[in-house]
Amino acid sequence: MLLLLLLLLLGPGSCLSEATRRSHVYKRGLLELAGTLDCVGPRSPMAYMNYGCYCGLGGHGEPRDAIDWCCYYHDCCYSQAQDAGCSPKLYRYPWKCMDHRILCGPAENKCQELLCRCDETLAYCLADTEYHLKYLFFPSVLCEKDSPKCN
């Protein structure tokens, strides 16, 4: 049973066909962040739902590995967007997936541009990482209280 769960989490994990991933126009809210990850990444977006100290909702402590650092920087990017008056978890923006590349826009405003760049950066960052099963479902109680400062 655990093996089946891991295969679902780490496999292609998408209901989108290859043709759809290559040339589909998306608009996103928080739930559609998975689409940008699916466009670029070698893993299912579900593989990051509860990984390390930062992948998933919230986050604190020292990031555990390169994947966790990607999620940490994404949290920082969302914080900066929020400071600029955007609502990262609710705001929608247009983008395309073409040949496993994210194409942001055309943006109607600065928030759309900022949020697409946050998600694009995360997707490319995660695509270049090695996955460590030991950080999947990592207990948050093992994450330190203090977090690094966002730049």
Curated annotation (Swiss-Prot):
Residues annotated as binding Ca(2+): 54, 56, 58, 75
A Pfam family: Phospholip_A2_1
Record text on subunit structure and interactions: Interacts with PLA2R1; this interaction mediates PLA2G10 clearance and inactivation.
UniProt keyword Transmembrane helix, yes or no: no
Keyword terms, alphabetized: Calcium, Cleavage on pair of basic residues, Cytoplasmic vesicle, Disulfide bond, Hydrolase, Lipid metabolism, Lysosome, Metal-binding, Phospholipid metabolism, Secreted, Signal
Pro-peptide region(s): 18-28
Protein name: Group 10 secretory phospholipase A2
CDD domains: PLA2c
Any GO CC annotation of this UniProt entry: extracellular space
Principal location: secreted
Biological processes per GO annotation: arachidonate secretion; axon guidance; cellular response to leukemia inhibitory factor; cholesterol homeostasis; defense response to virus; erythrocyte maturation; fertilization; hair follicle morphogenesis
Gene3D superfamilies (alphabetical): Phospholipase A2 domain
Disulfide pattern: 39-97, 53-143, 55-71, 70-125, 76-150, 77-118, 86-111, 104-116
Function: Secretory calcium-dependent phospholipase A2 that primarily targets extracellular phospholipids. Hydrolyzes the ester bond of the fatty acyl group attached at sn-2 position of phospholipids with preference for phosphatidylcholines and phosphatidylglycerols over phosphatidylethanolamines. Preferentially releases sn-2 omega-6 and omega-3 polyunsaturated fatty acyl (PUFA) chains over saturated fatty acyls. Contributes to phospholipid remodeling of very low-density lipoprotein (VLDL), low-density lipoprotein (LDL) and high-density lipoprotein (HDL) particles.
Keyword Calcium listed: yes
Gene that encodes it: Pla2g10
Cofactor(s) required for function per UniProt: Ca(2+)
Enzyme kind, highest EC tier: hydrolase
Family label: Belongs to the phospholipase A2 family.
Cofactor note: Binds 1 Ca(2+) ion per subunit.
Active-site residues per Swiss-Prot or TrEMBL entry: 74, 119
Signal peptide: 1-17
Chemical reaction(s) catalysed: a 1,2-diacyl-sn-glycero-3-phosphocholine + H2O = a 1-acyl-sn-glycero-3-phosphocholine + a fatty acid + H(+); 1-hexadecanoyl-2-(9Z-octadecenoyl)-sn-glycero-3-phosphocholine + H2O = 1-hexadecanoyl-sn-glycero-3-phosphocholine + (9Z)-octadecenoate + H(+); 1-octadecanoyl-2-(5Z,8Z,11Z,14Z-eicosatetraenoyl)-sn-glycero-3-phosphocholine + H2O = 1-octadecanoyl-sn-glycero-3-phosphocholine + (5Z,8Z,11Z,14Z)-eicosatetraenoate + H(+); 1,2-dihexadecanoyl-sn-glycero-3-phosphocholine + H2O = 1-hexadecanoyl-sn-glycero-3-phosphocholine + hexadecanoate + H(+)
Organism classification: Eukaryota, Metazoa, Chordata, Craniata, Vertebrata
Domain of life: Eukaryota
GO molecular function: 1-alkyl-2-acetylglycerophosphocholine esterase activity; calcium ion binding; calcium-dependent phospholipase A2 activity; phospholipase A2 activity; phospholipase activity; phospholipid binding
